[in-house]
UniProtKB/Swiss-Prot annotation:
The keyword RNA-binding applies. Gene3D superfamilies: Nucleic acid-binding proteins. Belongs to the universal ribosomal protein uS17 family. Part of the 30S ribosomal subunit. This is Small ribosomal subunit protein uS17. SUPFAM superfamilies: Nucleic acid-binding proteins. One of its GO terms (molecular function) is structural constituent of ribosome. One of its GO terms (cellular component) is cytosolic small ribosomal subunit. Keywords: Ribonucleoprotein, Ribosomal protein, RNA-binding, rRNA-binding. InterPro entries: NA-bd_OB-fold, Ribosomal_uS17, Ribosomal_uS17_bact/chlr, Ribosomal_uS17_CS.
Length: 107
């Protein structure tokens, strides 16, 4: 049987050779039938301490490595780039100012 693989975002890298990965999934509410986001955190083994907070990683199920670690980092899908996030925020702020300047939003 193949091992499970999940994709998530690194939320903590403070431990040696261990990262905490938050994995989001959509679950349908039993009564209201609306889809709701659920987040679960997994401790994953990072052999070379490569992962940093904000990186998107793929983790794979493995044998128990410690009391809480049952996953290992397979690969880093995307590195976190703070410059890109700041640029996107600036672009959004400029768009908001342009709309407000034209009188698009009334007070």
């Amino acid at each position: 049987m193949p091992r499970k693989r999940l994709t998530g975002i690194v939320v903590s890298d403070k431990m040696d050779k261990t990262v905490v990965v938050a994995v989001e999934k959509l679950v349908q509410h039993t009564i209201y039938k609306k889809y709701v986001k659920r987040t679960k955190k997994y401790h994953a083994h990072d052999e070379r301490n490569e992962c940093k907070i904000g990186d998107v990683v793929e983790i794979e199920e493995t044998r128990p490595l410690s009391k809480t670690k049952r996953w290992r980092v397979v690969r880093i899908i995307q590195r976190f780039e703070p410059e890109r996030v700041l640029k996107e925020e600036e672009d959004i702020q400029e768009e908001i100012e342009a709309v407000e300047g034209k009188g698009g939003v009334e007070s």
